[in-house]
């Protein structure tokens, strides 16, 4: 199997793993929200952090739709540069988000992980889609 053809399943698996972790965080975000707050917090503070994390996770899911659309439509499936970028960023996201969940990192760290590991590959995917005149 050539190196390019082995990137396709690896990219799909890392995209899927990242998606599963995001959905898991979405369903069980209570512990992560509490780690963002001081020991004594009000209901208002909790709702604010819950809204922030919900928005961040929702935008991440929207970017996944964009990236999966480009991948599954075949526009970027065999583009080796996008495959490597996606493989590296989504693998890094899986590791970082695992630490985010298990070590209960503060919520602001999610935005750093989001900007590097979700926005960057989605923007490149958008450029690829636009260059093929798919969108």
From Swiss-Prot:
The keyword Acetylation does not apply. Keywords: Cilium biogenesis/degradation, Developmental protein, Membrane, Transmembrane, Transmembrane helix. It is found in: Membrane. Pfam families: TMEM107. The chain crosses the membrane at residues 7-27, 55-75, 83-103, 110-130. GO terms for biological process: non-motile cilium assembly; protein localization to ciliary transition zone. It is a multi-pass membrane protein. GO terms for cellular component: membrane; MKS complex. May play a role in cilia formation and embryonic patterning. This is Transmembrane protein 107. The gene is tmem107.
């Amino acid at each position: 199997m050539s190196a390019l053809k082995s990137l396709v399943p690896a990219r799909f698996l890392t995209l899927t793993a990242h998606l599963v972790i995001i959905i898991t965080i979405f369903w069980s975000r209570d512990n992560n929200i509490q780690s963002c707050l001081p020991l004594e917090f009000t209901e208002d503070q909790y709702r604010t952090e819950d809204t922030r994390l919900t928005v961040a996770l929702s935008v991440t899911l929207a970017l996944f739709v964009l990236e999966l659309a480009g991948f599954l439509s075949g526009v970027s499936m065999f583009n080796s540069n996008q495959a490597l970028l996606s493989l590296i960023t989504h693998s890094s996201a899986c590791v970082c988000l695992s630490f985010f969940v298990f070590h209960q990192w503060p919520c602001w760290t999610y935005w750093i992980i989001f900007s590097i590991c979700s926005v960057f590959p989605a923007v490149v995917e958008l450029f690829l889609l636009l260059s093929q005149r798919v969108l």
